[in-house]
Amino acid sequence: MNVNIKTREYTTVTEVSGPLMIVEGVEGVAYSEIVEIETPTGEKRRGQVLEVREDLAVVQVFEGTSDLNTETTKIRFTGETAKIGVSLDMMGRIFDGTGKPIDGGPEIIPEKELDINGSPMNPAAREFPAEFIQTGISTIDGMNTLVRGQKLPIFSGSGLPHNELAAQIARQAKVLAEESEFAVIFAAMGITHEEANYFMRDFERTGALERVTVFMNLADDPAIERIITPRMALTTAEYFAFEHDMHVLVILTDLTNYCEALREISAAREEVPGRRGYPGYMYTDLASLYERAGRIVGKEGSITQMPILVMPQDDITHPIPDLTGYITEGQIVLSRDLHRKGIYPPVDVLPSLSRLMSGGIGEGRTREDHSGVSDQLYSAYAEGRDLRDLMAVVGEEALTERDRKFLKFADEFEKRFITQARDEDRSIEETLNLGWELLSLLPRSELKRVREEHIPKYLPGAE
């Protein structure tokens, strides 16, 4: 065995398989320890210890295992976990999935080196999420409100415009009447070059890049890198939020690619698979990402998460959206039917939900009538959708005058409330006023979910 005790350098690689390599005869190696690898050609790569069994270590190589062999590859265990150097200079910069600048700018001079796995928030130190975050999108602001410190995922499908929606939220999101700075951290995992170019062009064209920090893992980058990309982003978010009192919105896309990377690594390790081949610990792994959102008592800053995931075959019961739903505080669901009608953003408000909405709306936060308007819009749109199904069976002639008004409401709701331009930034006032305009299409006797004193104040044409 050829071992340098001081540097813990080994040349005892016994197997190379996929993204993994097995090193024998190791001593004092720890789980998640960072490894430096020197290829036979002298190229330097990095990896991480996945598993330790007696004198054997399983290492995942971030840059892939091509050109590595079992004879001359050198392995050095650093004794440290994966870290990222953080600084406020990261604002407006673009990094790859491992935290290296890829925008042609200078290297970041770090103010701190932080472990990318973070440290869990003490539940007793958490402050309940509150304070409205305005995204400029009516279906979110008006009916599925995002609040500061919440984790609210977007469930999409293949071919739906979740990338456009993510870019729009990154551009427009803001906390109203707050002096603290607002920042966006955008982490992309497994996206194509075309998608990456779209995001970069959009951020640069609109000037949003000034307040956005981007971490980009592309589809042809190693799958292993996808596991650390969101952790790099969240560690940076924690630094901005809890060291510099900033309100940080973290957008993670696409968590489905992240989970596929988890499955790939699990298969390479020959672990016993869980549901649909995903590892049994996927729930715990996702929770280690989602639970890094929140607010801490005594700290001004906050981390709000909007993870985006593409549901395979639009199946909301698939393990990825299913497990995500257990951990997060609601969901925004994109609809293929609305997309076929040419509606953008195709948010289906009926299965969508923000569980923490009540803490972020109302007088002093948005407007006194917000809750009632939202409930009434939900109720009326749900009835209009039911009547569409009924009309398909019995015909329009069988509907009453009241039924026709609800049908018209559902159509107008989709055309005017859900639909908006890709660069349209609606204020919460505009969203609520539009809601009242649509409610004016219904008989006043049907407005049972809004407070009576709000009707003459906000309903157009009311006395």
UniProtKB/Swiss-Prot annotation:
One of its GO terms (molecular function) is proton-transporting ATP synthase activity, rotational mechanism. Gene3D superfamilies: 3.40.50.12240. InterPro entries: ATP-synt_VA_C, ATPase_a/bsu_AS, ATPase_A1-cplx_bsu, ATPase_F1/V1/A1_a/bsu_N, ATPase_F1/V1/A1_a/bsu_N_sf, ATPase_F1/V1/A1_a/bsu_nucl-bd, P-loop_NTPase, V-ATPase_su_B/beta. CDD domains: ATP-synt_V_A-type_beta_C, ATP-synt_V_A-type_beta_N, V_A-ATPase_B. Its main location: membrane. It is found in: Cell membrane. Pfam families: ATP-synt_ab, ATP-synt_ab_N, ATP-synt_VA_C. NCBIfam families: ATP_syn_B_arch (TIGR01041), PRK04196.1 (NF003235). HAMAP family: ATP_synth_B_arch (MF_00310). Belongs to the ATPase alpha/beta chains family. This is A-type ATP synthase subunit B. It comes from Methanothermobacter thermautotrophicus (strain ATCC 29096 / DSM 1053 / JCM 10044 / NBRC 100330 / Delta H) (Methanobacterium thermoautotrophicum).
